[in-house]
Amino acid sequence: MKRRLGIAQALIGDPDVLLLDEPTAGLDPEERLNFKNVIRRIKGDLCVVLSTHIITDIESLCDRILVLCDGRITAFDSCGALADVARGKVYAVESTADLATPFHSMGPVTVDGKAYEKIISKAPLNAPALEPTVEDGYICFIEKLS
């Protein structure tokens, strides 16, 4: 409720830009959904700048993503373009125990009803390739920089 009131106060002066810092952190699922619906309704009328670490918020609310690294802008593009950074690098493997190549574990995933481990690997693998997400692209992008 406080966040909705804060947004309402910010909109009183009919601004061109609305800055939001971690706006959904700590919200329960229902309030988070309500908040996202408010943002969707107003984002056509003004520029909404959203600072968040919650990737699902970015995917559902943002048209473009700006990535900061050490205080510098390192990327500014669409969600799809950031996801494409990981294209051909995201795989579903049965086990990571025998992998000789470095990889980044992204957790469990189910493909065609079978459980796998989702990984990101710079080296091509003989495993089912997965469609990359914005989070996968972000991980690949950041690892390129470091």
Positions of the model-derived regions?
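Residues in the signature-helix immediately C-terminal to the ABC NBD "C-loop/LSGGQ" signature motif
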Residues: 3-5
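A short, proline-enriched helix->beta-strand linker immediately N-terminal to the Walker B motif
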Residues: 8, 12-16
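Conserved protein kinase catalytic domain
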Residues: 8, 36, 83, 135-139
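The start of beta-strands in P-loop NTPase/AAA+ ATPase cores
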Residues: 16-17, 46
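Catalytic Walker B motif of ABC-type/P-loop ATPase nucleotide-binding domains
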Residues: 18-22, 27
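ABC transporter nucleotide-binding domain
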Residues: 34-119
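C-terminal coupling/interaction segments
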Residues: 106-146
